[in-house]
Amino acid sequence: MENVLGLVALACGIIIGLGAIGACIGIALMGGKYLEASARQPELMNELQTKMFLLAGLIDAAFLIGVGIAMLFAFANPFVLK
């Protein structure tokens, strides 16, 4: 029982940590490509900015889904029988 709770805590930390790293890298790459594209074609900056913010929201949403799953495992763990 104690072993399962310890492994669940470790798994929650890994889910949140790797999700945060992935979201940060994804948003950084997307922001860099947005700057490159807006430097090449400044007339498309407003359209590209709208698409960039939509994609940033989707990337953050995927991370927050991972956080929600980690919180489910942390507080309402389906693997521990009470």
Swiss-Prot record:
Localization terms from the record: Cell inner membrane
Keywords: ATP synthesis, Cell inner membrane, Cell membrane, CF(0), Hydrogen ion transport, Ion transport, Lipid-binding, Membrane, Transmembrane, Transmembrane helix, Transport
Keyword Transmembrane helix listed: yes
Gene Ontology CC: plasma membrane; proton-transporting ATP synthase complex; proton-transporting two-sector ATPase complex, proton-transporting domain
One MF annotation (Gene Ontology) recorded for this entry: proton-transporting ATP synthase activity, rotational mechanism
Superkingdom assignment: Bacteria
Site (Reversibly protonated during proton transport): D60
Any single Pfam family the record assigns to this protein: ATP-synt_C
TM stretches of this protein: 7-27, 53-73
SUPFAM superfamilies: F1F0 ATP synthase subunit C
Membrane topology label: Multi-pass membrane protein
Main location class: membrane
Role summary: F(1)F(0) ATP synthase produces ATP from ADP in the presence of a proton or sodium gradient. F-type ATPases consist of two structural domains, F(1) containing the extramembraneous catalytic core and F(0) containing the membrane proton channel, linked together by a central stalk and a peripheral stalk. During catalysis, ATP synthesis in the catalytic domain of F(1) is coupled via a rotary mechanism of the central stalk subunits to proton translocation.
Quaternary structure and partners: F-type ATPases have 2 components, F(1) - the catalytic core - and F(0) - the membrane proton channel. F(1) has five subunits: alpha(3), beta(3), gamma(1), delta(1), epsilon(1). F(0) has three main subunits: a(1), b(2) and c(10-14). The alpha and beta chains form an alternating ring which encloses part of the gamma chain. F(1) is attached to F(0) by a central stalk formed by the gamma and epsilon chains, while a peripheral stalk is formed by the delta and b chains.
Family indicated by similarity: Belongs to the ATPase C chain family.
Protein name in UniProt: ATP synthase subunit c
Gene: atpE
